[in-house]
Amino acid sequence: MDKLRGARPLRLLLLLLALLPALRGQDLSMEECCDKGVEWANKNRICTSLPLISESRECSMTQVQCCRSKLEEHYCSDGIEFASVHEECDSHNGENSTCEAEYFKKCCYCCLLGKTAQVQGQSCEPNLKIGYQCGIVFRACCVKGQEGTDVSISDDAPKKEQVEISKEELDQEDPYLHDGCRGGGPCSQQCRDTGSSYVCSCFVGYQLQPDGVNCEDINECITGTHSCGIGQTCVNTLGSFRCQRDTSCGTGYELTDDSRCKDIDECETGTHNCPPDFICQNTPGSFRCRPKLQCMNGFIQDALGNCIDINECLSTNMPCPAGQICINTDGSYTCQRISPSCGRGYHLNEDGTRCVDVDECSSSDQPCGEGHVCINGPGNYRCECKSGYSFDVISRTCIDINECRRYPGRLCAHKCENTPGSYYCTCTMGFKLSSDGRSCEDLNECESSPCSQECANVYGSYQCYCRRGFQLSDIDGISCEDIDECALPTGGHICSFRCINIPGSFQCTCPSTGYRLAPNARNCQDIDECVAETHNCSFNETCFNIQGGFRCLSLECPENYRKSGDTVRLEKTDTIRCIKSCRPNDVNCVLDPVHTISHTVISLPTFREFTRPEEIIFLRAITPTYPANQADIIFDITEGNLRESFDIIKRYMDGMTVGVVRQVRPIVGPFHAILKLEMNYVMGGVVSHRNIVNVHIFVSEYWF
């Protein structure tokens, strides 16, 4: 029984089946299903697209298994024929599935072993542990070599002559006559006889299904048992997997069979474009054309293969020493000494190789007066006023310029202060000077932690705020005070049971017994003592979980009724059903219209707000096989409806008649009542049979 969450009611889905079963169509026989699978295998040589002829699970399994078994016979016959003709198996290149290649080579190898045993004069009865099917092929090929007959393991294998053996010979010669795995046995892949029974197993890459007979492919890509590396994608195949490279290899590389990138040797494959006078040299991902002709020292080969002179004088590393000039020659160069003469304002450098400017401004005797600045130029100099000064033609001196007065509002973003020869900018409170010395940028006051908790910087100021569960003090605007969430108008809805305020937050608690705090730390979650086995019910009692506790009830079937198997578990609620079971010749029991008597338990909360009827139980029944317009189902509450707190209405849902039990009045828990519900099947005004449901209703004192 599903528990209510919040203010939503619990809805019980109780399925009561009518005694008269619906008519079913006749299923196909197992032989017909198998014949269809064999026919498909002979015609298409594949079973993956096998069309199923019936919705029956048994028929589908039979059809698929017979198709696979027939394919295995085809593959095995092909392997035996290949071994008989070629005397080897490795040269066969199968283009079909891995499964075909597996059965082909298995029977081919086993046949070669039998032929070898016949040639060596050994017994045709295999004493190796090679498996049942391999043993049959081994013996057939060995006997074939002795008798000169063709080998066949299938009734319809093409171009094979059958070896007919009488029943007496079969009983004398075939040691596998009473083998449980004879003919492949019931197993889909591998079968091992244990004497009194058999054991099925699967090939590598497959796993045995729960039925112990069939095998299914293991998806190594999902189970993580593949060996694909980084940059590769695992692709599942039948019985195995393969690794596929995620990205292409790029120009100059090719993808190998093992999904690796291999360099393409363009020189070896002849895909290069080197001219006849060049030699192709392979490089990783490309190639290089190297000329056949080698040039002498002082020359270099051009794109056409011609040798041209190298101008050493244009090299970044000057080949000649200081004071000498480089002169290029054919295949070499020469160095020639320089003897310059300097004009006014220049002089020779220390090496005497070239003329350099004389810096008059760097001499101890300043050529310019006080307040001026000397500016050197090539071969001369000039005197100018320093930055921040202007030349006064009257006094012939440089005087300070008041930039703040001359360019008001254009130099500084906030405040301008004049200084001799310059000025500086300042900012108002809440700002600081930028790196350009003129602009003002916001000062992040939060870096000095002025607030007790959190600080938000704003343009030119800052704002204090508090973490969740606190509020800013109205006194100083800096300190944070705890918020009592439990005292807020919505505090009664924060926790489902009880709210306890703590600094900066709150805690929810639940009743001391029967409940635990839910993962959201707000709602209370019922503890199912029956599932946890923390109840104290005796062996003869049944534990029923209710909200906040449990009840031990001893529910027995009345006379002429028996329990229908084990107790039915429906969504955390036990339902006990008693079915009528009459003694022989008990006419009164047979005529009693009551067919089933059920007991179930439902737990409800005390609804905080009850504004409309709450649907709590659904009684569903399948209408009997007679026409619906000749039968009617009447639902009724016959006992336990205290204060008319419940009613039952009839509804039609999905072709079924449903009785909906509703709570129509508010009930304050704790409260316990037993509703006796009747579901009467009426035909022609007469009750044909009746089902009784006893619903034990427990109302919790809490709303959750």
From Swiss-Prot:
GO terms for cellular component: extracellular region. One of its GO terms (biological process) is extracellular matrix organization. SMART domains: ANATO, EGF, EGF_CA. Residues 357-441 are annotated as: Self-association and FN1-binding. InterPro entries: Anaphylatoxin/fibulin (IPR000020), cEGF (IPR026823), EGF-like_Ca-bd_dom (IPR001881), EGF-like_dom (IPR000742), EGF-type_Asp/Asn_hydroxyl_site (IPR000152), EGF_Ca-bd_CS (IPR018097), Fibulin-1 (IPR017048), Fibulin_C (IPR055088). It is found in: Secreted, Extracellular space, Extracellular matrix. Gene3D superfamilies: Laminin. Residues 177-216, 217-262, 263-308, 309-356, 357-399, 400-441, 442-481, 482-525, 526-579 form the EGF-like domain. Disulfide bonds join 33-59, 34-66, 47-67, 76-107, 89-108, 110-134, 111-141, 124-142, 181-191, 187-200, 202-215, 221-234, 228-243, 249-261, 267-280, 274-289, 295-307, 313-326, 320-335, 342-355, 361-374, 368-383, 385-398, 404-416, 412-425, 427-440, 446-455, 451-464, 466-480, 486-499, 495-508, 510-524, 530-543, 537-552, 557-578. Incorporated into fibronectin-containing matrix fibers. May play a role in cell adhesion and migration along protein fibers within the extracellular matrix (ECM). Could be important for certain developmental processes and contribute to the supramolecular organization of ECM architecture, in particular to those of basement membranes. Homomultimerizes and interacts with various extracellular matrix components. This is Fibulin-1. It comes from Gallus gallus (Chicken). The lineage of its organism: Eukaryota, Metazoa, Chordata, Craniata, Vertebrata.
